[in-house]
């Protein structure tokens, strides 16, 4: 037991010692290993590597590094590679400068890469240990650096390589076939020699390539511009861009695509934008004039590539559009047809909407420019609101031929686009009210649904305040229909006779309808006057405290008319009559649809054959302006509506002119509508002035109401801020001028709604 214990204890005290591996090698032995490796490297460079044992070479390199001779190995490698590249490779490349240069260089590069891969495999342990510990380039990269510095960047080789590549690309641009593979290999070599950077490729090739390209494209642009139209030029530039992109893809490094495309864009587009756009007989205006949507789309696509390209296009388009618009809305020459006027604007809008969709990709800048231009020229003509209302009036009247409800709806939607551009929406509202009243009172609306649909569009655009009176007009019409049913029932019950007059009365609420403040006088003939008095008594008995005032200018009548005279041709021979009801050999009966004023004039001729202008004026008491218009319609209108004749036969109505019934009148129609002269041409100048005065009066109240609303809320405001807020609130209806707003502020100060602050007269306070 004791022996075992001693033995155990003895084993415990004993320590094993491993002798360290000797880290030193005989210098002679080291040199022999290096000579072996050096010879192997040289054989690899000479492509005589078939007899080499890579395993043995790897072990030798491993041994040198392990025994701290890595530096000798690394330095020796650098010297051997450098010597080979200088003495063999560089010489071969220099000898080929004038013969197969690029192929020789590419072959040398490929051989060098192959050799360095093999050498790297042999010296793998040095890469893992010595290179890491000493923070030096690995074997493969060392080979790249030496090749870069001693071959590729060697004086004349570097220059010759750059020039060769540039010459080949220049030749290809001119249409020659070149060795794209050689270019691609050279560019790839330059990229690899940058050691994961672009510096070598960029400095030795890309920078001079871009400079050379800029000069080439500069010359090309001058040639293209001199020889081609705008559309052909654009196509050539597009082709050039695609060609350069394709060349980068197949020959150069992909990173060159962006800079070379920018050079093309700068030299072929940016520097010549104005010239391209303004080319005579082929530029932007020519394309717009001739509806060249595809060419415009090409120009848009090309110009969208460069800064301010689309802005340049927009400015040119805007000048042309404004010129076209101003020509359409010019106030030169009276008698412009409102329907044609608005249709012309709608056609122009449709054209540019088509360009916007098909050519300009619905681009926001173009959209805003077109809208701004339409707003500009539409508001140049003060008649635009009236004409737009007349246009809508024309589309909502009965008898619009060739249009379906959907087509009318589409036209009205387009009209609403113009309405949005209109600054004086309150003026439009006033005219729309007049024209709607005329349609409703003469039963000319195509349908209540169409009318209400249009009002709904206006309501959506401007709010219920804008349309409340229009909706009130419809309510009045509905109530009037009920009232007339009750009146007819009353006549049946009481047996009261209207003396052969078929009377229809519309009772209108003063605030809703465009009634005139001073109702024009008119001596209504006894028969219709008697019929109306019966209705008046009936109505006031039901609604005590109300007043009924006849609005003669809004009324209409159907008259039974008989013409007795023969109808003659210009040679004096008599002709037969069609369309009229013939009761005797030459007697013809028609129903004449006329205004109240026209009815009053015509019924005078039941008493006498002839009347002078003064006599008619005295008998009817119609205001002179209305009387002249009515007589012009009856005696100077179309031959198929000329129921009176006048002496002398002129279009003007003046004192002393004599009027008689035109017994030779005939028409193919039994019912003859006597059009009011210039009714479709809008208001006369005096009427327009009167309307404008009413609008200005309404605006005063609206501006004051807005000022009071704002000041009541804010209590205290500086003048300019208040003016800006008032403008903002009212711009949906009209644009008040700062001068007018200032006058209304002063008016409110005088009436003590507002007051100026003592310390600053440009600051106002609200007086509760």
From Swiss-Prot:
Q: How is it modified after translation?
A: Neddylated. Attachment of NEDD8 is required for the E3 ubiquitin-protein ligase activity of the SCF-like complex.
The record's disulfide annotation reads none
Q: Tell me which domain of life the UniProt entry assigns to the organism this sequence originates from.
A: Eukaryota
Decide whether keyword Ubl conjugation is in the record: yes
Against Pfam families, the record matches this protein to: Cullin (PF00888), Cullin_Nedd8 (PF10557)
List residues of the Cullin neddylation domain.
698-760
List the molecular function annotations (GO) for this entry: ubiquitin protein ligase binding
Location of the protein in the cell: Nucleus
Q: In which pathway does it act?
A: Protein modification; protein ubiquitination
Query: Which key words are in the record?
Result: Cell cycle, Cell division, ER-Golgi transport, Isopeptide bond, Mitosis, Nucleus, Transport, Ubl conjugation
Where mainly found? nucleus
Instruction: Report the GO terms under cellular component.
Output: centrosome; Cul3-RING ubiquitin ligase complex; cytoplasm; mitotic spindle; nucleus; polar microtubule; spindle pole
Which BP terms does GO give this entry? cell migration; COPII vesicle coating; embryonic cleavage; endoplasmic reticulum to Golgi vesicle-mediated transport; integrin-mediated signaling pathway; mitotic metaphase chromosome alignment; negative regulation of Rho protein signal transduction; positive regulation of mitotic cell cycle phase transition
Segments of this protein annotated with the region Disordered = 677-698
User: Which residue numbers mark the cross-link Glycyl lysine isopeptide (Lys-Gly) (interchain with G-Cter in NEDD8) in this sequence?
Assistant: 712
Compositional bias (Basic and acidic residues):
682-698
- Would you identify the family this protein belongs to, as annotated? Belongs to the cullin family.
What's its job?
Probable core component of cullin-based SCF-like E3 ubiquitin-protein ligase complexes which mediate the ubiquitination and subsequent proteasomal degradation of target proteins. The E3 ubiquitin-protein ligase activity of the complex is dependent on the neddylation of the cullin subunit. Involved in ER-Golgi transport by regulating the size of COPII coats, thereby playing a key role in collagen export, which is required for embryonic stem (ES) cells division. May play a role in the regulation of mittotic entry via ubiquitination of aurka.
Q: How does it assemble?
A: Component of multiple BCR (BTB-CUL3-RBX1) E3 ubiquitin-protein ligase complexes formed of cul3, rbx1 and a variable BTB domain-containing protein acting as both, adapter to cullin and substrate recognition subunit. Interacts with btbd6.
Q: What is this protein called?
A: Cullin-3-A
Give the classification, highest ranks: Eukaryota, Metazoa, Chordata, Craniata, Vertebrata
Q: Which gene encodes it?
A: cul3a
